[in-house]
């Protein structure tokens, strides 16, 4: 039966090449557009190295503090200070790992007596390397002991290593200048795409090796600063337990702050919520976000479905007599309707394959523009999109589901009308 549907679909392609080609290309462009929208969100949430554990990550990228002497709506918002990060999150018993790291910054690197170059930097602790799966091609990450001691060690990417030394191998142990201070290279990792929103940098150093945790980088008595926290859960089912422990830690921390107190604004966030958490003082409305996504997909599906439905209706006009003959020889209305929908599904799936290929090519070639957001404007490198970030099994599932939905929307009504017409009208070539 399925083989027969394929034959019938190919026969239509030969008999009505222009109409069928327009229909297939229209469907392909629709699927392409929908999949680009899906990938724009997917690339923010789907795991890929070095953020392969995204489905187990919780984030606290900013928070708020207020004071009993301030007005009711008065608050200071932004990243936290180191004392807050340690007081509220370090050593969580319900989590597998907790890492404290800084907001992205630019550091100047150079060889002694060399030309300085600005690159993207993160300052982290040792747990950072156990949460994210970087690919080391030389050396190793710096350890907890090195962070505790404040040693000037660094991990750099292979492109930075080639820029400085002309090679990315046998670089560990050598010295470079980082903001005019001498650092020893601990390891070299493969380049990281800037789409890895938490792990991305070109150089990583211990936050204890600089002065970033104090001085002008903190305010509100050290409560606020430039630190962030990422939490690795043993399982996503532990998220609520982790949030509950974070809340207990917050209350205990507040008890020692005097007139100050901190609050999380709904955090820790999972990966999806974090991607929508744009402002430090506003908790994202995820219900509104999901409604917006549903409306977008309905528009993207319904508008082309109406056009494709009229094309399906035009193709059926040329098959009215055939439908009448089938009905006169005992074919049921359900059988006629099912065959029309199935034949149209074959064409829709063909178009879906073409549309998915279009989408992958467009995303790979122009992904830096399609998937860029305001965060990337402040980085020193352009966004890099890799096949492994786009080529996911879930991508095929989404494409298949949209093909099925588009097929039902575009062929359901014409098929129903064709199955309901009288045998006499069908044999006389009338499609009312």
Model segments located where?
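Membrane-helix entry/capping segments
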Residues: 3-4, 11, 252-296, 318, ...
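C-terminal membrane-exit region of the final transmembrane helix in multipass inner-membrane proteins
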Residues: 5, 25, 392-432
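Intracellular coupling helices
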Residues: 6-18, 306-347, 417-431
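Hydrophobic alpha-helical transmembrane segments of multi-pass inner-membrane transport and secretion
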Residues: 15-44, 284-321, 349-354, 405-406
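Transmembrane alpha-helical interface segments in multi-pass membrane proteins
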Residues: 18-29, 321-367, 398, 402-406, ...
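Membrane-proximal extracellular/periplasmic loop immediately following the first transmembrane helix
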Residues: 37-108, 115, 223-226, 373-384
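Short acidic/polar micro-motifs at solvent-exposed secondary-structure junctions
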Residues: 62-78, 96-127, 140-154, 192-193, ...
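Mid-to-C-terminal secondary-structure elements
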Residues: 127-141, 152-282
């Amino acid at each position: 039966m399925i083989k027969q549907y394929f034959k019938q679909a190919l026969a239509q392609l030969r008999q009505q090449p222009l109409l069928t080609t327009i229909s297939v290309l229209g469907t392909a462009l629709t699927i392409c557009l929908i999949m680009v929208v899906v990938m724009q969100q997917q690339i923010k949430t789907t795991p890929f190295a070095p953020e392969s554990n995204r489905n187990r990550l919780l984030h606290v990228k900013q928070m708020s503090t207020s004071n009993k002497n301030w007005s009711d709506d008065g608050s200071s918002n932004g990243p936290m200070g180191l004392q807050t990060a340690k007081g509220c999150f370090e050593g969580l018993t319900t989590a597998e790992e907790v890492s404290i790291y800084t907001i992205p910054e630019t550091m100047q690197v150079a060889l002694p007596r060399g030309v300085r170059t600005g690159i993207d930097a993160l300052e982290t602790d040792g747990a950072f390397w156990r949460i994210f799966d970087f690919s080391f091609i030389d050396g190793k990450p710096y350890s907890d002991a090195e962070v505790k001691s404040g040693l000037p060690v660094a991990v750099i990417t292979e492109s930075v290593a080639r820029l400085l030394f002309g090679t990315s191998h046998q670089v560990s142990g050598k010295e470079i200048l980082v903001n005019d201070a001498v650092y020893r290279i601990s390891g070299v990792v493969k380049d990281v795409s800037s789409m890895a929103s938490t792990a991305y940098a070109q150089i990583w150093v211990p936050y204890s090796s600089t002065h970033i945790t104090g001085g002008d980088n903190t305010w509100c008595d050290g409560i606020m600063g430039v630190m962030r926290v990422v939490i690795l859960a043993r399982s996503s089912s532990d998220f609520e337990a982790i949030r509950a422990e974070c809340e207990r830690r917050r209350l205990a921390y507040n008890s020692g702050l005097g007139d100050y107190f901190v609050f999380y604004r709904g955090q820790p966030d999972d990966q999806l919520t974090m991607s929508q958490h744009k402002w430090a003082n506003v908790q994202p409305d995820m219900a509104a976000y999901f409604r917006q996504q549903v409306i977008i997909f309905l528009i993207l599906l319904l508008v082309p479905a109406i056009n494709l439905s009229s094309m399906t209706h035009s193709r059926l006009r040329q098959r009215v007599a055939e439908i009448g003959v089938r009905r006169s020889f005992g074919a049921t209305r359900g059988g006629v309707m099912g065959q029309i929908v199935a034949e149209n599904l074959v064409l829709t799936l063909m178009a879906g394959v073409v549309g998915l290929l279009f989408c992958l090519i467009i995303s790979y070639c122009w992904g830096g523009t399609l998937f860029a957001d305001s965060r990337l404007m402040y980085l020193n490198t352009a966004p890099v999109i890799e096949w492994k970030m786009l080529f996911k099994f879930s991508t095929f599932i989404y494409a298949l589901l949209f093909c099925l939905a588009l097929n039902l929307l575009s062929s359901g009504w014409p098929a129903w009308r064709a199955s309901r017409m009288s045998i006499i009208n069908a044999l006389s070539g009338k499609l009312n």
